[in-house]
Design a protein with these regions (language model features):
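Short, glycine/charged-enriched secondary-structure capping and boundary segments
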Residues: 18-20, 43, 79-80
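A polyampholytic, Gly/Pro-enriched intrinsically disordered region
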Residues: 48-54
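Thiol-based oxidoreductase modules, predominantly thioredoxin-like and allied folds used
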Residues: 25-48
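C-terminal cap of thioredoxin/glutaredoxin-like
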Residues: 70-95
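A short, hydrophobic beta-strand/beta-hairpin element that forms part of a small beta-sheet core
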Residues: 61-73
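Thiol/disulfide oxidoreductase modules built on the thioredoxin-like
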Residues: 54-61
């Protein structure tokens, strides 16, 4: 399953949510709905090499696609092109 981190108020996430909201192989996680989801995403963003430029620019880094092996694509364009950046394993459910 691929986790997709999005946020309701994010204009870049609108198309992603429309495309993947009803597909069982994808888990859409709205980081604005629960503190636990936000903490999970921030832990990933603060430590994964895929977010280096995102952090430098002061951006958030969503939408974000995370495969089970921990590799990440930070845009729909990169996801569609299969451009994932390897890194640390995926953050486990409930990790802080």
């Amino acid at each position: 399953m691929i986790k997709i981190y999005v946020m309701e108020s994010c204009p870049d996430c609108t198309e992603v949510k429309a495309l993947y909201s009803n597909h069982p192989e994808y888990e859409l996680i709205d980081i604005g709905r629960q503190a636990r989801s936000l903490k999970e995403f921030l832990a990933l963003r603060d430590h994964h090499p895929a977010f280096e430029k995102v952090r430098q620019r002061g951006n958030i880094g969503i939408p974000c696609f995370v495969r089970e092996d921990g590799s990440i694509a930070i845009s729909l364009k990169h996801f569609d092109a299969g451009r994932f950046i390897e890194g640390t394993p995926a953050i486990q459910e409930g990790a802080s």
